[in-house]
């Protein structure tokens, strides 16, 4: 569960290391984002030579959450951290690599490029 002011690790090589959620995209009163949902983030820390700089505002897709997510078959999945992958306006990832596993829910939300770059899909 990601809401406004939540800090997330950035799980790609775009240059950003940490980002803060500033808006959950969806219906007007939506408060929480889960795995596979789009959010708007502000980059809080970045590497000096990266494509993304500190202070940049970007869209992102949540790929891991510390709060467990229930699946249709009754199982739950949770991760040790909250993480997101930065995307552009065409919903393509900004980076060329994705670090760490991503949840199967990302595939169900049609972010195939992120799934193909991920080393593992759980």
Swiss-Prot record:
Keywords: Ribonucleoprotein, Ribosomal protein, RNA-binding, rRNA-binding
GO biological process: translation
The UniProt record lists the keyword rRNA-binding: yes
Keyword RNA-binding: yes
Pfam families: Ribosomal_L14
GO molecular function, a single term: structural constituent of ribosome
HAMAP family reported for this sequence: Ribosomal_uL14
Task of the protein: Binds to 23S rRNA. Forms part of two intersubunit bridges in the 70S ribosome.
Stated family: Belongs to the universal ribosomal protein uL14 family.
Subunit record text: Part of the 50S ribosomal subunit. Forms a cluster with proteins L3 and L19. In the 70S ribosome, L14 and L19 interact and together make contacts with the 16S rRNA in bridges B5 and B8.
PANTHER family, alphabetized: 50S/60S RIBOSOMAL PROTEIN L14/L23, LARGE RIBOSOMAL SUBUNIT PROTEIN UL14M
Protein name (database record): Large ribosomal subunit protein uL14
Gene field: rplN
